[in-house]
């Protein structure tokens, strides 16, 4: 993270530029994917509708953390931001838990539970999330009879941490504020948003 900006100003600046670039590329891809369609008037109307929908989506991210998590684009933008803070493991764990809950096979459930534990929960895990010792031990105990709810406590604590800590910083980030300003202008005028900066 950029806590020691006086000591490492270039590193923080580079991470901020990287986030802005990633978000710009992400937005450019979103615009390209919305360009497919029919000819003439219908294509223009369809594109305008998608741009308004995307603008509403972007503006909706600031309404609540749940709104951000409910948006595929929001999750992608938030993930890009978290990478600049070296804390993407929190969101990746939360997403892994959401996918885990969809597993119906008991064999796959147990196997996937151990994989998630080894990847995010155990001490010194490659992507260890910031949870307390009691939650870590409870989750370890839950693995003995893995169910779709065995990560619920750890997932809840990670979600709360992101909501109270990372999410407010995401909303205050220059990249999101620029994006929200473009989205507001698009919603107000009904015109196409400006091409995002890739610098």
Curated annotation (Swiss-Prot):
<dbReference type="GO" id="GO:0009968">
    <property type="term" value="P:negative regulation of signal transduction"/>
</dbReference>
<dbReference type="InterPro" id="IPR044926">
    <property type="entry name" value="RGS_subdomain_2"/>
</dbReference>
<feature type="lipid moiety-binding region" description="S-palmitoyl cysteine">
    <location>
        <position position="2"/>
    </location>
</feature>
<keyword id="KW-0343">GTPase activation</keyword>
<feature type="lipid moiety-binding region" description="S-palmitoyl cysteine">
    <location>
        <position position="12"/>
    </location>
</feature>
<feature type="modified residue" description="Phosphotyrosine">
    <location>
        <position position="167"/>
    </location>
</feature>
<dbReference type="GO" id="GO:0007186">
    <property type="term" value="P:G protein-coupled receptor signaling pathway"/>
</dbReference>
<dbReference type="InterPro" id="IPR036305">
    <property type="entry name" value="RGS_sf"/>
</dbReference>
<dbReference type="GO" id="GO:0016020">
    <property type="term" value="C:membrane"/>
</dbReference>
<protein>
    <recommendedName>
        <fullName>Regulator of G-protein signaling 16</fullName>
    </recommendedName>
</protein>
<dbReference type="Pfam" id="PF00615">
    <property type="entry name" value="RGS"/>
</dbReference>
<keyword id="KW-0597">Phosphoprotein</keyword>
<dbReference type="GO" id="GO:0043547">
    <property type="term" value="P:positive regulation of GTPase activity"/>
</dbReference>
<dbReference type="GO" id="GO:0005096">
    <property type="term" value="F:GTPase activator activity"/>
</dbReference>
<keyword id="KW-0734">Signal transduction inhibitor</keyword>
<keyword id="KW-0472">Membrane</keyword>
<feature type="domain" description="RGS">
    <location>
        <begin position="64"/>
        <end position="180"/>
    </location>
</feature>
<keyword id="KW-0449">Lipoprotein</keyword>
<dbReference type="InterPro" id="IPR016137">
    <property type="entry name" value="RGS"/>
</dbReference>
<comment type="function">
    <text>Regulates G protein-coupled receptor signaling cascades. Inhibits signal transduction by increasing the GTPase activity of G protein alpha subunits, thereby driving them into their inactive GDP-bound form. Plays an important role in the phototransduction cascade by regulating the lifetime and effective concentration of activated transducin alpha. May regulate extra and intracellular mitogenic signals.</text>
</comment>
<keyword id="KW-0564">Palmitate</keyword>
<feature type="modified residue" description="Phosphotyrosine">
    <location>
        <position position="176"/>
    </location>
</feature>
<dbReference type="InterPro" id="IPR024066">
    <property type="entry name" value="RGS_subdom1/3"/>
</dbReference>
<dbReference type="GO" id="GO:0005737">
    <property type="term" value="C:cytoplasm"/>
</dbReference>
<comment type="subunit">
    <text>Interacts with GNAI1 and GNAQ. Interacts with GNAI3, GNAI3 and GNAO1.</text>
</comment>
């Amino acid at each position: 993270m950029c806590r020691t900006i006086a000591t490492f100003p270039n590193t923080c600046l580079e991470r901020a530029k990287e986030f802005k670039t990633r978000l710009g590329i992400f937005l450019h891809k979103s615009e390209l994917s919305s360009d497919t369609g029919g000819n003439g008037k219908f294509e223009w109307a369809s594109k305008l509708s998608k741009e308004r929908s995307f603008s509403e989506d972007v503006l909706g991210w600031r309404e609540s953390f749940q709104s951000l998590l409910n948006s595929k684009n929001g999750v992608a933008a938030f993930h890009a931001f978290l990478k600049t803070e070296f804390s993407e493991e929190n969101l990746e764990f939360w997403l892994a838990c959401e996918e885990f809950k969809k597993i119906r096979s008991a064999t796959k459930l147990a196997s996937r539970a151990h994989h998630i534990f080894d990847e995010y929960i155990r001490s010194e895990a490659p992507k260890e999330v910031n949870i307390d010792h009691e939650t870590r031990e409870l989750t370890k105990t839950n693995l003995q009879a893995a169910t779709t709810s065995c990560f619920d406590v750890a997932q809840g604590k990670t979600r709360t941490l992101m909501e109270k800590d990372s999410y407010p910083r995401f909303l205050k980030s220059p990249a999101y504020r620029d994006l929200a300003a473009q989205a507001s202008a698009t919603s107000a005028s009904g015109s196409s948003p400006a091409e995002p900066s890739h610098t």
